[in-house]
Amino acid sequence: MDYDFKVKLSSERERVEDLFEYEGCKVGRGTYGHVYKAKRKDGKDDKDYALKQIEGTGISMSACREIALLRELKHPNVISLQKVFLSHADRKVWLLFDYAEHDLWHIIKFHRASKANKKPVQLPRGMVKSLLYQILDGIHYLHANWVLHRDLKPANILVMGEGPERGRVKIADMGFARLFNSPLKPLADLDPVVVTFWYRAPELLLGARHYTKAIDIWAIGCIFAELLTSEPIFHCRQEDIKTSNPYHHDQLDRIFNVMGFPADKDWEDIKKMPEHSTLMKDFRRNTYTNCSLIKYMEKHKVKPDSKAFHLLQKLLTMDPIKRITSEQAMQDPYFLEDPLPTSDVFAGCQIPYPKREFLTEEEPDDKGDKKNQQQQQGNNHTNGTGHPGNQDSSHTQGPPLKKVRVVPPTTTSGGLIMTSDYQRSNPHAAYPNPGPSTSQPQSSMGYSATSQQPPQYSHQTHRY
């Protein structure tokens, strides 16, 4: 390359340190790199941004794939990549996103902590409905554009704080997303293990090779149940964190303890699953005779005749062929009864959730989880965010993660497929404060976060 051209190119290249002020504003840290809350130096706007510095030098193929997807996706409920900076001097890669102040993992933890402190603060019904509708809207857009997310969980669902997009849901972390219109080989061959265990569909646990967008719908059902109860519905101890074998006995056992063992008539193709013989060897149908989703949700005061429960049943249908689609779910009667979903999930009320705190350069954002991770090496397999959660001694660990990855905050940019018309209901009552004993950890909008929740739910190492 011509020397003069290289000099000219270098002089014209925008440098992140010249454009943004971010020193001392770290909000996330992990094996993926670092995330900073940043502002423009030129004062052209007063917005907050999230700057993610990718760990290491250069750019990996997985990062290239994620960036390529993010540059194409434009929808109000999907994260939007603003810009990519390449530092020529140290070969660092920086990604710029809009800053999201909250995420579902911290929101749910806030309510779970209030319950643990005997000062229960329920997630308002209207907020749950608005959150679910916007998640479905974003996933419908992805699926309509032939994209599987493959790692949906509360930590990857961001919620914008004060500002023009107040209360807007952003689906984050496209690190495991894949196009599924014409794969060269079965997706299971490309990535044998996807989706954090607690949110993993039964067909994945049974080794399905040609899995579909139904895996995202199951994960949304898990998130919906967690919003309704403040407890992860399929939490269990995790083992074999490094295994590439999708079959997981304990996770299947947890699902059957909640849902019951699937009858042949309910899932006819279960016999075609690669791990069906292992399933029949390890499990006895009569062990789960008294288990059902109705009984589980009744314990959490969700009535089986409610529209919320009926939709949950459709999302958590064992047979992926019979599982509802995102488009069908958005048309469910649940969204037609009061309170109606709103574009601001907080419905104009005061936001009760704490803002993210800054980390020191030496302070890992997952300091509260580091010890847990060492103890859980076989217990947590999470794609970068491990949710331990638990109501009893069997769930003292968090959901396993796969590779630690970061979840960028996001912005809105208009939808290619459909932008919902959210109907606004009457404002919900303001949330009571559960008190100082429920202090929240640093949230890292899907980037990464410190988990300081009660020991039984020292949930997760967040990421971006």
UniProtKB/Swiss-Prot annotation:
Q: This protein's superkingdom?
A: Eukaryota
Could you list this entry's UniProt keywords, alphabetically sorted: Activator, ATP-binding, Autism spectrum disorder, Disease variant, Intellectual disability, Kinase, Nucleotide-binding, Nucleus, Repressor, Serine/threonine-protein kinase, Transcription, Transcription regulation, Transferase
* Biological processes per GO annotation: positive regulation of transcription by RNA polymerase II
Q: Where is the composition biased (Low complexity)?
A: 373-391
Cofactor names from the entry are: Mg(2+)
All disulfide bonds of the chain are none
Mutagenesis or variant effect for R178Q: In IDDHBA; decreased protein kinase activity
What Enzyme Commission number(s) appear in the record?
2.7.11.22, 2.7.11.23
One Pfam assignment: Pkinase
Q: What is the effect of changing V193G?
A: In IDDHBA; decreased protein kinase activity
| InterPro entries membership | CDK, Kinase-like_dom_sf, Prot_kinase_dom, Protein_kinase_ATP_BS, Ser/Thr_kinase_AS
Q: What happens after mutating V27L?
A: In IDDHBA; decreased protein kinase activity
Q: Indicate the impact reported for R424C.
A: In a colorectal adenocarcinoma sample; somatic mutation
Q: Where is the active site?
A: D151 (proton acceptor)
Q: Where is the composition biased (Polar residues)?
A: 409-426, 436-464
Can you tell me which family this protein belongs to?
Answer: Belongs to the protein kinase superfamily. CMGC Ser/Thr protein kinase family. CDC2/CDKX subfamily.
Subunit composition? Answer: Component of the Mediator complex, which is composed of MED1, MED4, MED6, MED7, MED8, MED9, MED10, MED11, MED12, MED13, MED13L, MED14, MED15, MED16, MED17, MED18, MED19, MED20, MED21, MED22, MED23, MED24, MED25, MED26, MED27, MED29, MED30, MED31, CCNC, CDK8 and CDC2L6/CDK11. The MED12, MED13, CCNC and CDK8 subunits form a distinct module termed the CDK8 module. Mediator containing the CDK8 module is less active than Mediator lacking this module in supporting transcriptional activation.
Q: Which disease is it linked to?
A: Intellectual developmental disorder with hypotonia and behavioral abnormalities: An autosomal dominant neurodevelopmental disorder with onset in infancy. IDDHBA is characterized by hypotonia, global developmental delay, learning disability, and behavioral abnormalities, such as autistic features and attention deficit-hyperactivity disorder. Additional variable features may include non-specific facial dysmorphism, congenital heart defects, ocular anomalies, and poor feeding.
Q: What is this protein called?
A: Cyclin-dependent kinase 8
Q: Species name for this entry?
A: Homo sapiens
| Gene behind this protein | CDK8
